[in-house]
Amino acid sequence: MAAKSDGAAAVAGPGPEGPAGADRGGAGGRGEAAAGIAGPGPVEAGCPGPRYELRDCCWVLCALLVFFSDGATDLWLAASYYLQGQSTYFGLTLLFVLLPSLVVQLLSFRWFVYDYSEPAGTPGPAVSTKDSDIVGAAISTKDSAVAFRTKEGSAELVPRPAPSSAGTYRRRCCRLCVWLLQTLVHLLQLGQVWRYLRALYLGLQSRWRGERLRRHFYWQMLFESADVSMLRLLETFLRSAPQLVLQLSLLVHRGREPELLTALSISASLVSLAWTLASYQKVLRDSRDDKRPLSYKGAVVQVLWHLFTIAARTLAFALFASVYKLYFGIFIVAHWCIMTFWVIQGETDFCMSKWEEIIYNMVVGIIYIFCWFNVKEGRSRRRVTLYYCIVLLENAALTGFWYSSRNFSTDFYSLILVCVVASSFALGIFFMCVYYCLLHPNGPMLGPQAPGCIFPEAPGPCGPPADAITSPPRSLPRTTGTERDGVAVGGERAGTPTLPVFQVRPGLPPTPVARPLRTEGPVIRIDLPRKKYPAWDAHFIDRRLRKTILALEYSSPATPRLQYRSMGTSQELLEYETTV
């Protein structure tokens, strides 16, 4: 979740049809191959890009409903504890609401400050292009400054012309109003609500506007969705997860039927955790054009998967904590340390700096206390199996220790709780298997893999085609004059025409395909290797790159394409283009 690129450069150059030598090669002058990426979503060149649909709008509205229900029930429960005179429960409940919210609002406001700040001495990040063939224009992201260098005789990338005094005054007033509004929104702890509404607005604008503005608004919508998904992931595991364990522990400790308000708070926290995890994975896949998007069916099944596994996990925690409070704290700290070390040992590559990567790994360690979260590239089947085997053993041990120290007058009640833990975990594993076997974007886990984004069909077996001649050529006898004149050879009737040795198969005439005229836009070469899934691309977590890309995309009449520096071996497809 970094905001800096440590001086990485983004270079805008010509497309594949531009001058020779500019379409291949390394970014930053290192002579290394460049990995191509362009905009959100895999689409064919010349075809319309992904559109914002009604179900996308409904998904955002449901996310807002989950957010408000979680916060409102927690605050309502804290007020109930206060009115009942239970100051300890009131303080703990309010602490788990306010402290994570303050942390997330500070991070969100920091992102806003960077996004809306202007470098000294420049009119802002907005730029314009005279033509679409931009040759040699370099955009540096060092120290948040945007500099432009062009070759002589080429199309020029120029800053926006200086506004008049009246325009400057109006612009400053607008900026002041935006700053005051954002400050008020974040003081009211509504930064995420603002980002949800803005993502909804940008998505609707991308549907209603023309082609060029549609792409621009769609990019902005994806950036805003990525921001709010990261913020929600951080907040839910700092607020909803501890709140869920606390309320369940109090419920088990009292040994009576739950009140309606307590049950609502527990349910809202549980749904918030499951929803945030599924929403994060969906936005992450939607943002990468090298991965197939996650369908809404898969997202709903992911919600059910995490809902039941987290419910079993937190109930086991609550049962154990209701009897062994000190040992429960030791267990949580030990589990967090082991999981954090496991994540660090996997050498994740999510952030732009070392210290931010360490902080991120610590947050992932907190997530691993409750549920599975993929942080490493490649097939995760073994890691998922190992993790849930450990969780199963821990849940059984925690529940067993609590059951051994139970009150024997409530045997039936204790047996019901044990069955709830076991059945909830089994249901969660069932929905996980349904997701991986039927609804995974890459295809069934045990069946054939679905076609990828770059290759529409699965590659066939290596070797020559069926019509190819695999045997080496043999020497043919010389054709005599008699044979050329049609004389029978080997008993055939004279005058019978012989078939030619080589034949050309008649083929259908090529059908002319009407291709829409399109202008090649700038190629933005980023002097960084592209991060591998499940990490975010650098232009999503580095806000300098984001500002530069949005400025070029808005000013260019064609879709800009991004190229990351490739650290691996050369591939057949070094550049591929998608429409935003």
UniProtKB/Swiss-Prot annotation:
A GO-annotated cellular component: plasma membrane
Residue segments, region Disordered: 1-35, 470-492
Chief localization: membrane
Ranges of Low complexity composition bias in the record: 1-22
Membrane topology, record value: Multi-pass membrane protein
Regions crossing the membrane: 59-79, 89-109, 260-280, 303-323, 326-346, 355-375, 384-404, 415-435
Compartment list: Cell membrane
Keyword annotations: Cell membrane, Membrane, Transmembrane, Transmembrane helix
Family statement: Belongs to the XK family.
Entry protein name: XK-related protein 7
